[in-house]
Every structure is written in structure tokens, then in C-alpha cells.
Amino acid sequence: PEIATRIAQYELAFRMQTSVPQLMDFSGESKETLESYGTKGADGTYASNCLLARRLAERGVRFIQLYHRGWDHHGGIKNASAGTAKLCDQGTAALIKDLKQRDMLKDTLIIWASEFGRTPMAQGSGRDHHIKGYSMWMAGGGVKGGMTYGATDELGYNAVEDVVSVHDMHATMLHLLGIDHEQLTVRFQGRDFRLTDVHGNVQDRILA
């Protein structure tokens, strides 16, 4: 069985490698699709990667991560943020619209987040890391659309209403993927660990 498993792994790796040229060939995409994403082809831009994400999802890839590097605005935030937002907004919006048009959005969970937010007050020409109150958004499979959950204080500094912890977020994400977070464990150094540790509650009010 171990030899058969190893052979299967090599065969899977080969199939993945040989599928890349077709995956990266955007010539079959319409002009309207390319323009909606804001890309001319597989050029490595964020917009191009958004389109690539849709193509990966069509081929059954279950986890896809996109990222944009340009948000580390410790300086020059006034000049940088508008352009950075535009680059992200167009491709992201096109991806959601494209998935919906293809009847894929209902089966795809989209999570837009970063590891922390930014302070509500400027520090020089930029803003520092901030973990006490920041936003993220979700769309697609199982998520209730058109709603805002939680709130910060009047300064935008502390989360004060319907605060969602990282463990709560993980519990909710796993629930949307059909996984009970209290049953999912990973064994490490003789102990079974949960992703949500001994915490985490599914946030039912954001579920469709």
C-alpha cells in the first residue's frame, strides 16, 4: 500500500504540472472578461491572479489564496492607498461577479482579510499596525449578504459590539465548510489540538 500511495503521489504531481500550460492560457477568455478584471492576460498582476483563481476553481481546486503586497502603509498612505485600493477592487469585484454568473458563488466561500488593521489616527505620513478593531468581509457559500456585523467605538479604535475573535472566525469558516470545529483535531506532541483551541463559537447571525 505504501508503494502504491507513493506512485499515486508522483502521478498526481505529474498531472498537476502538465495542467499548468492550459490553466495559464487565457486566450479563450473573452475581451469583456479580461477588461472586467483589468488584465490583458496571465501577466502576474493581482487582476490576472483573480481571473486565475476562477479558472482554478473551475478545475476543482479547493483552496485558493490571493494576496496583494502593497498595503504596508507606514508612510505615504495618502498617495498609495487610493491606487492600491483600485487595483484590488476591480479584480476582486470581477471575480465575485464572474463566479455568480457561472453559478459558482453559492459553492465558493470568499474571505477577504489581513492579519491586522491600521490605526485610525495618522502617525507621520502613515499608520501603524492595529489589532483592537478592524474589518474583513465574506461572500459566497452560506454567508448572508448585504449586512454589517459588529462595530467599533466612535474613534474606530476598539471593537465594542458583536466582537468576533480569531477562534470565532475559524469556527464559523469551518462550519461553512461542513466541518465541526470541536471535532477537528491535529495531534502534536502527544496531545490533540483544535484549531479553535478551547474557544470559538459559530457566528450564526452571519449565516444565510
Where on the chain are the PLM-derived regions?
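Ligand-binding pockets and gating/stacking loops
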Residues: 1-208
